[in-house]
Amino acid sequence: MQIQQPPPEVARVGLRGIKMLATADGEFHTLERGLMDAAQKHILGTQFELDDLESITPRELADGIPQPLREQISNGCLITALIDGEASSAERLLLDEYAEAFGIKSPELTNLHRLVDNHLLLFRLDVARRSFLGQRVKKFVAERGLRGISHLIQGLRKAENQEVADRYRGLGDCAEGTLGRSYLDFTRKNGFSVPGEIGGPPEPVVFHDCLHVLAGYETSPLEETQIASFQAGLMKKQPMFGMFFMLAQFQLGIQVTPIAGAEFMQVDPDLMLKALVRGTQVNRDLTSDWDPWDDFEKPVIELRRAYNILPR
């Protein structure tokens, strides 16, 4: 995901538009305030008093935001609409007006419509398909064909695949401090199974646990919101669906993945944006074209340096 720091005068215009969206349902929620403060802290580098921001029309907003920044402001509005745990009809209407003024048509906005209209099956399917999870599964099946599909089905049926399980258990032979050894230690410490074991995740999800290790996030719901935001930050293809995935799973209570149950109102806006920006600084999209097996024998500290994974 590319995030730009606009000039202060442009940032103020954008914040006015976001505040209009936040208050469209008649309430300026604490989480919406927190999100706007976090955006100023981690992205904009400004300190505007939110209560002093004037109202603005969609046309005025579009006139004040140059083309390269319109998608970024639109994404900020989408996150704002969801951060309080629900999307309202009033927010949807204003988002439609913003999109028309910006000249933007996006699948993200289509999915916000699905949320408001309670078309949750379509929402789940599309977010899962476009998020890092869907991209990973698609790549896994494309590379392994019918055998890959068979492995996925076997895992969902809670059946053991000893060949796959033994391969991952063998990572215990890697040197201490390597990604392979650290990944296996991470799974065992948290009571997880490895792929191939009963209850283990499908192989396309292994990268996620490896990113937990590389980025230093734990597994509580609050920590999961941060690793998911971090992942969205380093995604090059449809990164906003990484944020949609996280917000649905941990803020809206809508289960998108069959691997873990949904949580409600777990997001801290400041920590979320801090993790998102941290992800944008990584120099490779580790959610799509990275195979952890290429790096399992390398030291974690070396990989953090190679991929520019900065300290928390």
Predicted segments, located by residue:
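Core of folded catalytic or high-affinity ligand/protein-binding domains
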Residues: 147-301
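Domain-length accessory/inserted modules outside core catalytic folds
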Residues: 1, 47, 300-312
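Generic structural signal for short, solvent-exposed loop/turn connectors between secondary structure elements
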Residues: 41-64, 188-204, 208, 312
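Generic alpha-helix signal with a bias toward terminal, lower-confidence helices
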Residues: 33-34, 40, 52, 77, ...
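Short, flexible helical or helix-coil boundary motifs
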Residues: 43, 80, 144, 279-283, ...
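Small-residue-enriched hydrophobic alpha-helices in membranes
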Residues: 1-166, 263-269
